[in-house]
From Swiss-Prot:
Residues that coordinate or bind L-citrulline: 90, 95, 126, 130, 181, 190, 266, 278
Record field: transmembrane: none
GO terms of molecular function: argininosuccinate synthase activity; ATP binding
Subcellular location: Cytoplasm
Pathway: Amino-acid biosynthesis; L-arginine biosynthesis; L-arginine from L-ornithine and carbamoyl phosphate: step 2/3
Domain of life: Bacteria
Subunit details: Homotetramer.
UniProt catalytic activity: L-citrulline + L-aspartate + ATP = 2-(N(omega)-L-arginino)succinate + AMP + diphosphate + H(+)
Residues binding ATP: 10-18, 37, 120
Name of this protein: Argininosuccinate synthase
Amino acid sequence: MSAPKKVVLAYSGGLDTSIILKWLQTEYGCEVVTFTADLGQGEELEPARKKAELLGIKPENIHIEDVREEFVRDFVFPMFRANAVYEGLYLLGTSIARPLISKRLVEIAAEHGADAVAHGATGKGNDQVRFELSAYALNPEIRVIAPWRLWDLTSRTRLLEFAEAHQIPISKDKRGEAPFSVDANLLHTSSEGKVLEDPGVEAPDYVAQRIVAVEDAPDTPEFIEVTFEKGDAVAINGEAMSPATILTRLNELGGKHGIGLLDFVENRFVGMKSRGVYETPGGTILLEAHRGIEQITLDSGAGHLKDSIMPRYAELIYNGFWFSPEREMLQALIDKSQEHVTGTVRLKLYKGSARTVARWSDHSLYSEAHVTFEEDAGAYDQQDAKGFIQLNALRLKLLATRNRRVAGK
């Protein structure tokens, strides 16, 4: 295959992608366009511009974009309407960011007439799959370059040696070592590598970057109210906010109260198990609040069906199939279920816990008259339960009769 002439690189300014930038230049002699997404990772992105310029990228070929609102509105919120959780615990913070990055890579490639895009995901992880499935779904003709599957820089040590040889600056943490492998956005921060690769060793306290230790969280609980319209959060404590602002505020509250820290060994799509430490403070609160408002507004049949498809929906996102027809079909079903998921939830934030303590809605299906232990003024005739039970017991009785008859032979 011929060398690409122009490549759009998903560029963070970190170690891997800075090395990839230089490698693309030296390996192919091609022009490189960089794309850096502000997904709310909480760091200054202008250094990425300066580093790209230092590595020879033309100013007009450097794209740094604030996509926080689009990220939360079009990716995070639709996912949270489903209460999506992978393997019972993981809130998909890394997974859900990849489709948006891939979308912009493909769009920028078209704008610049580039014949390829490139990413910094390793050949062992899920992100390579997510980036590439999304890119091919949006442009089946695009060429994707994955240096980790092509070069011989197969360890952190060799990467550092390459960086030093090409005078690429590398950030160091306070222990004098290259940082953990970290992925951050407005929804979460993940940490992998180093001591975390041994699942039998407790993660050091310094791994957590967004969330205070539970022991250091305030000794007094804090109560907040989250308001929803059709399944999406629209206000906190009565104040209307944009999607990204809501998640930012919930992150602040959750981090302050030690909420949303997860030490998790997951099953990667590529077949291996991996261990990571995930911090999802705002997302943890949002999930609890959304479940709380659904409890009184969602019909039981619709809710149980929605719960049954959630694992499949979450798996599709985890595995990189955001732009697949099956994900879109499930999304349509989920969104239909949210038509009346409107109301307000009060939560108690305290020492690592976000707990729903009250919920109310003009769309509520909750009828106190039907469930009260007191006089219900004829709202419910308890005698109706007899026929209901008899009909549901009929098949069980027939089964038991058959089994006795067969056993007696």
